[in-house]
C-alpha cells in the first residue's frame, strides 16, 4: 500500500510540475489543476493520466501539448511510433506545431535521444521525454536558475542588429535536452534570452540558440 501511495504522490507532483511549466509557456491548464491525490490514484489505475492542453485563446499561434504517461514498461521505438501514428496521423489530435511529452520511469538514455533526433529531422515532430523523478520539482523555481525566455522573430532581429550578428553559428548553443530548455519548451533553432544578475548592471541578457 505504501509503495502504491508513494507512486501516486509522485504522479500527483509530476502533474503539478508539468502544469506549472506549461502555464508558464502560455498554455491553458485550468481543466487539470483541481484533481486531488485520490483522483490521480484512480486515474493511474484506469490508465487515464494523459492530458491534452491548448495554449490560451486568442493566441497568434494556436498549439497543443499532449502529455502521455508511459510507466508500465521500457519506452521503445515501436511505442513512440504507435503514439505518433495515433496522435499525429490517425486521430490527428496533434499537428507538427504541437508537442508530445512522454513521462517515463527511467532516465532517457542516448539511443532514445537519438531516436527523438531522427524523428525531428525526418518528420518534424517534436517530442520531449521526462524521467518521472525529474518532475518532482520545478527547475524554473530553483534559486540558481536564471530566467530563460524564448524570444520571437522580431526580438531575434533586434538582438542580431544590436550585437552585429549575421550568422546563427556564432551564437552559443543550448541543447534541446538541457533541463531548462525542456522546461520552457525549446525546439531546435529557437533562441532564448537568459536574464542574469550582473556586477556592472542590475541584470544582463545572454542569448542561446537551441541545438539537437
Regions found by a protein language model. Give the residues of each.
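Extended boundary segments
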Residues: 115-159
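Short, structured beta-strand/loop micro-motifs enriched in basic residues and often containing a Trp
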Residues: 166-178
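Helix-rich terminal scaffold detector
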Residues: 1-98, 110-122, 133-138
Amino acid at each position: 500500500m505504501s509503495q502504491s501511495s508513494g507512486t501516486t504522490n509522485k504522479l500527483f507532483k509530476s502533474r503539478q510540475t508539468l502544469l506549472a511549466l506549461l502555464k508558464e509557456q502560455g498554455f491553458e491548464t485550468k481543466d487539470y489543476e483541481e484533481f486531488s491525490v485520490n483522483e490521480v490514484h484512480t486515474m493511474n489505475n484506469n490508465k487515464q493520466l494523459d492530458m491534452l492542453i491548448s495554449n490560451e485563446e486568442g493566441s497568434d499561434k494556436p498549439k497543443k501539448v499532449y502529455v502521455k504517461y508511459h510507466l508500465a514498461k521500457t519506452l521503445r521505438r515501436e511505442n513512440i511510433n504507435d503514439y505518433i501514428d495515433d496522435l499525429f496521423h490517425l486521430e490527428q489530435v496533434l499537428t507538427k506545431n504541437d508537442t508530445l511529452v512522454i513521462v517515463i520511469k527511467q532516465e532517457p538514455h542516448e539511443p532514445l535521444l537519438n531516436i527523438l533526433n531522427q524523428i525531428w529531422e525526418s518528420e518534424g515532430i517534436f517530442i520531449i521525454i521526462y524521467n518521472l523523478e525529474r518532475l518532482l520539482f520545478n527547475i524554473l523555481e530553483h534559486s540558481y536558475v536564471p530566467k530563460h525566455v524564448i524570444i520571437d522573430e522580431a526580438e531575434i532581429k533586434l538582438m542580431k542588429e544590436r550585437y552585429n550578428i549575421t550568422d546563427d553559428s556564432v551564437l552559443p548553443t543550448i541543447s534541446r535536452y538541457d533541463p531548462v530548455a525542456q522546461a520552457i519548451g525549446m525546439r531546435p533553432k529557437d533562441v532564448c534570452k537568459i536574464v542574469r544578475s550582473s556586477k556592472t548592471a542590475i541584470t544582463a541578457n545572454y542569448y542561446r540558440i537551441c541545438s539537437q
